[in-house]
């Protein structure tokens, strides 16, 4: 069942987990350390490679595993077609036609993660073929896999698993976040959900949250599972949920330090920023929970020598911006270097998010030497120290403006070195993803 070099497919790890001889266990760990024995790890996520932050994390983690001698596999929902040289290790779960049907069905029923039976049967057959030692799940909600079938399979096969919580969906009856709504029903039992029209959106005529909540509680209970959170905030919430008896460890997200670093750029000239003090923000699709109201109000409060630059607008959203030269909207950066240039040239990066886990944009700004101002919400504030920025009470517009001005008046040069050092020490992608490999080793040697 387990991946061994030279086709040595012996159930050594099963022996260890069953309480095998201590000397033999130490011998096997030695064999693993020097890659005489290898492990197979399967990641499962909604997206892969270019599919948002979790798709990129899945891709990057696969590469880190391969560099460390681990046989790495990925199964993902949609949004990418594996190349010919990837097809043995990268598996797309849904076709475009199945994706269209499952999106409609999921939005109609509200049972995110409880449809897609045919697609999941094919996935389980593929898992039977590759025989992973560990299954590492990321986002399993949405409309690409039947969570009930998947988790029951993992339980029946007694496969150790990891689940990285990129949001709160794992222990709620519907929502991915509840900070904005202020709902705490997830602590005792979901019903009459106030967030059915929020992500993951549903138009179900009957509230599905109670059924979803009870089903998740039942399915996760028998698993040999370790939860991972990118933030301490989410790990603390997990300990207040029905998952509280399952282990949870914090592994922060990371970014590529060779890509995100301070550079000289011509973005100020290209976008007409000039010598004005540049306040950078990522638009987040101008979603309310991502701070839309604060981003749209801020330009009216700025001085003539200050400008807000909003990057990541969707097509047509420029029309929503205030009619003033104190805001510049950018749909997408043309190249990765341009994005790095925007981070590097900014005097301050702001993230007025109202609910979030551990925003990668904060890490990218830090790595480029730019201080951060963010609301004290979710895990967003965890990256900020007195040397790297300021944290403001959630929803405090006056406090947000005051913090921006404090940093602008102090000068970015007072923050650059501390921001970069914190990024290098705490959020280096290679170091952070290496922690997953250590976690896999610890799980298999229990």
How should each PLM-predicted stretch be described?
Residues 413-426, 435-438, 442:
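A short, well-ordered alpha-helix in the C-terminal region of glycosyltransferases
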Residues 386, 390-397, 406-411:
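Conserved acidic donor-binding segment of nucleotide-sugar-dependent glycosyltransferases
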Residues 236-239, 255-270, 319-321:
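Acidic anion/phosphate-binding donor-loop and adjacent secondary structure
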Residues 272-290, 296-299:
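Conserved donor-binding/catalytic core segment of Leloir-type glycosyltransferases
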Residues 341-346:
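Short alpha-helical donor nucleotide-sugar binding micro-motif in glycosyltransferases
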Residues 371-374:
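Short hydrophobic beta-strand element within catalytic cores of glycosyltransferases
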Residues 317-337:
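Nucleotide-activated donor-binding/catalytic signature segment of Leloir-type glycosyltransferases, i.e.
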Residues 354:
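Aromatic "clamp/platform" in nucleotide-sugar-dependent glycosyltransferases that forms part
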């Amino acid at each position: 069942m387990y991946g061994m070099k030279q086709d040595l497919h012996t159930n050594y790890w099963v022996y260890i987990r069953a309480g095998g001889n201590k000397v033999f266990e130490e011998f096997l760990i030695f064999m693993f350390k020097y890659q005489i024995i290898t492990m197979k790890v399967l990641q499962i996520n909604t997206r892969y490679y270019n599919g948002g932050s979790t798709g990129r994390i899945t891709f990057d983690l696969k590469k880190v595993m391969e560099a460390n001698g681990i046989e790495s596999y990925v199964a993902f929902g949609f949004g990418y077609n594996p190349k010919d040289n990837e097809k043995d290790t990268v598996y797309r779960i849904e076709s475009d036609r199945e994706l269209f049907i499952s999106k409609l069905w999921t939005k109609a029923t509200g049972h995110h993660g409880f449809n897609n039976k045919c697609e999941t049967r094919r996935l389980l057959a593929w898992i039977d073929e590759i025989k992973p030692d560990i299954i590492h799940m990321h986002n399993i909600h949405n409309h690409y896999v039947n969570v009930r079938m998947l988790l029951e399979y993992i339980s029946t096969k007694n496969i150790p698993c990891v689940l990285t919580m990129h949001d709160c969906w794992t222990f709620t009856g519907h929502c991915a976040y509840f900070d904005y709504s202020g709902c705490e029903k997830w602590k005792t039992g979901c019903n009459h959900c106030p967030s059915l029209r929020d992500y993951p959106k549903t138009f179900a005529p009957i509230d599905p949250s109670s059924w979803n909540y009870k089903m998740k509680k039942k399915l996760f209970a028998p698993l040999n599972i370790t939860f991972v959170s990118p933030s301490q905030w989410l790990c603390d919430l997990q300990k207040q949920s029905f998952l509280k008896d399952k282990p949870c460890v914090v592994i922060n997200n990371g970014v590529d330090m060779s890509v995100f670093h301070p550079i000289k750029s011509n973005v100020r000239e290209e976008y007409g920023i000039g010598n004005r003090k540049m306040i950078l923000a990522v638009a987040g699709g101008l979603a309310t929970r991502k701070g839309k109201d604060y981003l749209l109000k801020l330009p009216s409060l700025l001085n003539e020598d200050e400008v807000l630059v909003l990057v990541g607008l969707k097509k047509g959203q420029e029309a929503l911006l205030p009619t003033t030269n104190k805001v510049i909207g950018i749909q997408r950066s043309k190249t990765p270097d341009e994005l790095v240039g925007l981070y590097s040239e900014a005097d301050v990066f702001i993230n007025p998010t109202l609910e979030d886990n551990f925003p990668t944009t904060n890490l990218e700004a830090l790595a480029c030497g730019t201080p951060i101002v963010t609301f004290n919400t979710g895990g967003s504030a965890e990256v900020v120290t007195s040397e790297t920025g300021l944290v403001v009470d959630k929803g405090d517009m006056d406090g947000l403006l005051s913090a921006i001005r404090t940093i602008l008046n102090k000068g970015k040069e007072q923050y650059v070195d501390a921001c970069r050092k914190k990024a290098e020490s705490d959020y280096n992608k290679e170091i952070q993803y290496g922690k997953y490999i250590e976690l896999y080793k610890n799980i298999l040697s229990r």
